[in-house]
Amino acid sequence: MTIPSATSLRRFTALVGTCLSLTMNADAAVEKILFNFQTATNSPAWQVVNDDVMGGVSTSQFQVLTNGGAVFSGVVSLENNGGFASVRSAPVRENLNGCDAFVFRVRGDGRRYKFTVRTESGFNAPNYQAEFTTKRGEWEEHRLAFKDFVPTFRGRVLTDVPPLNPANIASVGFLISDQQAGPFRLEMNWVKATGRPN
């Protein structure tokens, strides 16, 4: 019987280690931080867009807190055929190929919200949306798969546009339009995209 030399054993061990490393990396999750509200330098200006653009009187504000985190809050009114308030990020121009979902950490008020995504920056661009419901006063992480986002325009579902294209993300945001009048408050820590490589 031939006994392997010490050099051969070292080479074999190194090869096994390399193979294990490649396997683990292949299975490792992809994660890309889009906004970290715990760090002010990573929280560029966000813009509120409410139903006053169509005659409504809902109000909202978005504030990045000095001690970390951000808050989207306001009052939804159903008067004048209104009923929504929203906030969206400054243009980000992200290529999220390799990811398959958005994940964010928020603390809400028990109301239903939507996470919104645009792939174009124009005012008349489609708005892709996916719903999530918060638990009052509890911090939660919500994961919304790209495939579950529905293209809309001014509240109407579009059937003649392609699915969300993760390679061309122009902006993201939050929307409340649950047809319930009254105050709302959504605190947030961060927004990221995740997935596993093919």
State where each predicted segment sits:
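Bacterial N-terminal signal peptides that target proteins for export
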Residues: 2-14
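Bacterial N-terminal signal peptides
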Residues: 13-23
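Beta-rich carbohydrate-recognition modules and glycan-binding surfaces
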Residues: 2, 24-198
